[in-house]
């Protein structure tokens, strides 16, 4: 999926507005994913998955940090996310559908925290971006 210049502007502007909250939102989105889609918990048998868990928050920050890297390298996502793609495809063997589920929960979390900024155009741009990131992360599965 190709991101238009308007998409890139929407994504960058939105991500910049998150400021220091990206990690917090990543943890909240991950917790929301586990609660809404219980099968996603199978990849984290060693985690305390209870609400407010420090392990979930820490992993959510890793997710947010990876997305921050992706935002900074929107023009070359395959290179920027290559190591992460390898990790999820070859070591963790995460079912690709889980990226779509987490993406949905990220959109919901961002909409909850920034309703005024979450216009239809921003929603569409972020959805395209998360879909593109998911595609890159699953590209090595084939």
From Swiss-Prot:
Keywords: Heme, Iron, Metal-binding, Oxygen transport, Transport
Subunit text: Heterotetramer of two alpha chains and two beta chains.
Any one Gene Ontology cellular component term annotated for this protein: hemoglobin complex
GO molecular function, one term: oxygen carrier activity
Family as reported in the entry's similarity comment: Belongs to the globin family.
Residues given in the record as O2 binding sites: 59
Function: Involved in oxygen transport from the lung to the various peripheral tissues.
Tissue note: Red blood cells.
SUPFAM superfamilies documented for this protein: Globin-like (SSF46458)
Pfam families on file: Globin (PF00042)
Name recorded for this polypeptide: Hemoglobin subunit alpha-1
Membrane-spanning intervals of the chain: none
Residues covered by the Globin domain: 2-142
Alphabetical GO biological process terms: hydrogen peroxide catabolic process
Organism of this sequence: Arctocephalus galapagoensis
Binding positions for heme b per the UniProt entry: 88
């Amino acid at each position: 999926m190709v991101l238009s210049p308007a998409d890139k502007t929407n994504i960058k502007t939105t991500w910049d507005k998150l400021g220091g909250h990206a990690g917090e939102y990543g943890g909240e989105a991950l917790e929301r994913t586990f609660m809404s889609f219980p099968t996603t918990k199978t990849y984290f048998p060693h985690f305390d998955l209870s609400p407010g868990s420090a392990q979930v928050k820490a992993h959510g920050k890793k997710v947010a940090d990876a997305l921050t890297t992706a935002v900074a390298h929107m023009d070359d996502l395959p290179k920027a996310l290559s190591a992460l793609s390898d990790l999820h495809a070859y070591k963790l063997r995460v079912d690709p559908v889980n990226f779509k589920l987490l993406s949905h929960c990220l959109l919901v979390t961002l909409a909850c925290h920034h309703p005024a900024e979450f216009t239809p155009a921003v929603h569409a741009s972020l959805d395209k971006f998360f879909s593109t990131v998911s595609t890159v992360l699953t590209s090595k599965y084939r």
